[in-house]
Each structure stands twice: as structure tokens, then as C-alpha cells.
Amino acid sequence: MKLVILDRDGTINQDSDQYIKSPAEWKPIPGSLEAIARLTQGGWRCVVATNQSGIARGLFDMATLNAIHAEMHRRVAQVGGRIDAIFFCPHAADSNCECRKPKPGLLREIASRLDVELAGVPMIGDALRDVEAAAAVGAKPYLVLTGKGRKTREAGGLPPGTEVVADLAAIAARLAP
């Protein structure tokens, strides 16, 4: 199985310091939906791994998160793509859970549920925590320059082997030529 793991906010959709709290606030980054479609049509299974601490903060509930994800699924399907699964951490940053990126628990859950090894699996995100989580499980870290990506690159400290790409469309073109 060809698997690619995608961060959500800042990678697929526009990020917000106020959090994405409703389907109406979920706005795709230009080209990202088509990139997912390209990956899907190229035989890749696309899985999302996202921190969603807005739940723990009381900014939105599970029903709202499900509605946001339903909108994402709908919009991706409209252009011929598919997101095979969404894995998320609902905990606050100070919760000490094992699933909040940069800890590797969320990615290990993906490996367990899908019965796959993550060595070399592309993990694409816009934040240091995304590429650190990828490196922790032996996945291939890619940093996109959308969302927080430019600031992340400028801050330095990327794990060895991290590749920097303009956006999700650029890496999709490479993985599914």
C-alpha cells in the first residue's frame, strides 16, 4: 500500500490562530484539494493526522469537528480525491498525552490501525511538530511552506532528512507524476 500522511491546518486548509471552529471557517489552500485528488488517482491512500486541541479548550465539540471533516471530505471528493481516514488528538498541549504531535502516538495509531510500517512513508506538514513526529517513527518528513511553514523553516532545527517543498501540490506532483 502506498500511504501518505497529511497534516490538516496549514497543509490542506488555511490555518487560524483562532482555530477552525466551523465548516464555514474551513478554507482549502489553493491547489491542495487537487493535490489530494492527484495522490488518490496515483494510487496513494491519503490519511490525515491532526492536533485539534480546540476540543479540550471548549472551542468546539466532536459534532462540530465531524462536520468540519465532512466538509473537507465533500470538497476533496468534488475534485476526484479521497481522504481514507482522519486521526486526531483532541487534547490540550499541557495534557501530557502521547497522541499530540510532535509525540509519535498519533502516527503509531495510524500504523497499528492500517497494519503498515511507517519507515519512509511521506508525512507532510507545515509545523516543526509535524516533521518531528514523522522523524520519530522513521517516516519521511516533508515541510510545506504554506501555513506556518515559512516561519518553521526560518526558525531552523528541522530533523535531518526533512525536505522543504512549496506546498501540497508540489509534493503531489513528485509522488504521483
Report residues per predicted region.
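Metal-dependent phosphoesterase signature
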Residues: 12-30, 55-64, 78-82, 91-98
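Acidic, Mg2+-coordinating phosphoryl-transfer loop and its flanking beta/alpha structural elements
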Residues: 123-163
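Short acidic-hydrophobic, aromatic-tinged amphipathic segments that line or gate anion-handling sites
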Residues: 163-170
